[in-house]
Amino acid sequence: MSKAFDNLRLYAGVLKRVGYTLTLGMLGSGSRDELLKLYNSYNGQQPSGDSTPVDPFIIPKTDVFELFGNDSAAYEGVYECGFGHTTEFELKVISNLVRKWNPRRIFEIGTFEGRTTLNMALNSDTDTEIVTLDLPAEGLASTKMEIEEGEVRYVKKEVSGERFMGHPAASKIRQVFGDSASFDFEEYRNSVDVAFIDGSHAYEYVLNDSEKVFTIIRKGGLIIWHDYTNWPGVWTALNELYERDPRFKGIRHIGGTSIAMLTV
């Protein structure tokens, strides 16, 4: 009985600390450190030495206001967020990036329901081609590398790209299917102006997709990654590319989002 009481008291103490940190504690000067301590404890990261919290997001930030002027992009379905989707604000950022780069060809890795695909189509010229690559459900058992366990449900969907099916803008979209680790990108070499990477979030796949996209992006083109701050495999891979590969030294994390971007 005493053990159960101790557990209950411990739970109440943790709940109190979390509640304070996420409310009144946010007003304090040490709020960021406190949040990082909680984050690191939940993710099994133990700070060393002076117990300074470990911030896993090392890529420099850029302010969204440095990227755009007035928000003139058109949006469709931005309020219909859910698991696996970009947020409303992220979708607006991506839409504005597409408008700013005015691409002739966009290549997307990871179609899912096609919400971002549709909005990129709506915010690009009528002659822009959007190619979107998705792993079919039947390909789950034969991927070249392992995907994250939590991603299986995003692959096992009834329809890929259902958001843009039947939409007038769908005429600009070409769906292709396969595993990005074994897909032949040769047809698209040096022909892509904007690439959006939102496929598997496993470390090896993020490295693979980033490398593959580098072979198809034109000089002056834009690479966009989603979920930099949401999946350990993504931030680990992008941090590594930023620190070790000169080609990726210009990556920036757009503040207030999980988006990272690189002008090639």
Predicted regions located by residue number:
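Membrane-proximal basic amphipathic "stem/tether" segments
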Residues: 1-72
